[in-house]
Design a protein with these regions (language model features):
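Transmembrane alpha-helices and immediately adjacent membrane-cytoplasm interface residues
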Residues: 49-77, 98, 102
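Juxtamembrane inter-helical linkers in multi-pass membrane proteins
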Residues: 40-42
Length: 296
């Protein structure tokens, strides 16, 4: 995977290397160089200066950052509108790294499994088509499920899992909320309240945009718009149903691609700059304090 390192993985690699290097210096100096130095010169650790002292002081900080970022919480920024209205461009979220397992920070191999994604979870994962980037979508289908998306309506036939009577397919419940203030390409969007598993959340649909059946991923042996989720994979969709490149188009998300579970928004910025403004477009021009909190 090193030939396809995304920005988050590259940072993890650099952070890991820096931690290993400064840690090696820390322990070499503490248990070998320092005793020899004090014996020969009488210079104590507190009086020591230079690059060795700097490396020793950096190690605890880098080690703490590595542990927190690799195994506890990692920050991510939402760059697009595919998860509107749940997540907006400019939201900065916290992702639980331990929700689905503890992974090594470089090769992303599972060290200790801790759980499985549940229907309705919002997950960050490595793009199956482009390992250089991470995606964020909502888990709709679990291994063994049959997912049907037809006429912009979602149906789920849960996996049988050895039951004597297998569950029947059902339409995922939703209620119309109204026309949203969010617009895509100048078109107002319909907003619905959807009940997916134990999660109640909002979705958007564009009433003027037809379904792109010709672009859907067609699973061998299944009709267009119908998918059977393989073992060890998941079916993920964006809440902005007509503006999301997701499992409907590229297929299934492998379990090993999971990065973590999105759980909260810790800050949210706006970047709505006037075209004539001299303010750099990459700098925020406002803060949405009402966005801070848990994600559903």
């Amino acid at each position: 995977m090193l030939s396809f390192i995304n920005s988050a993985e590259l940072f993890s690699l650099i952070l890991t290397l820096a931690t290993v290097i400064t840690g090696s210096i820390f322990f070499l100096d503490k248990y070998r160089w320092q005793p020899q130095r004090e014996k020969e010169t009488g210079v104590t650790d507190k009086e020591q200066t230079g690059w060795v002292a700097q490396a020793r002081s950096m190690f605890p900080v880098l080690f703490a950052i590595l542990i927190i970022r690799s195994f506890i919480i990692e920050p991510f920024q939402i760059p697009s509108g595919s998860m509107q209205p749940t997540l907006l461009p400019g939201d900065f979220i916290g992702v639980e790294k331990f929700a689905y397992g503890l992974h090594d920070p470089v090769f992303h191999k599972t060290l200790i499994p801790t759980g499985k994604p549940q229907r309705g979870d919002i997950t960050v994962f490595i793009d199956p088509e482009n390992p250089k980037i991470d995606l964020i979508k909502r888990i709709v289908g679990l291994p063994g499920d049959t997912i049907i998306y037809r006429d912009k309506t979602l149906y789920i036939k849960p996996a049988c899992n050895g039951q004597k009577v297998c569950p029947a397919a059902y339409e995922v419940p939703k209620q119309f909320v109204g026309v949203t203030k969010f617009t895509e390409l100048g078109t107002d969007l319909d907003e619905y309240k959807e009940h997916l598993g134990n999660v109640e959340h909002r979705i958007l649909r564009d009433p003027n945009l037809p379904e792109m059946y010709s672009r859907y991923y067609q699973q061998p042996g299944s009709p267009v718009g119908e998918w059977v989720v393989p073992k060890g994979h998941y079916f993920a969709m964006g809440d902005n149903r007509d503006n999301s490149l997701d499992s409907r188009y590229w297929g299934f998300m492998p379990e090993q691609n999971l990065v973590g579970k999105a759980t909260f928004i810790w800050i949210s910025f706006t970047f709505n700059h006037n075209p004539d403004s001299s303010w750099p477009s990459w700098l925020p021009n406002g803060v949405r304090f009402n966005r801070i909190g848990a994600i559903h």
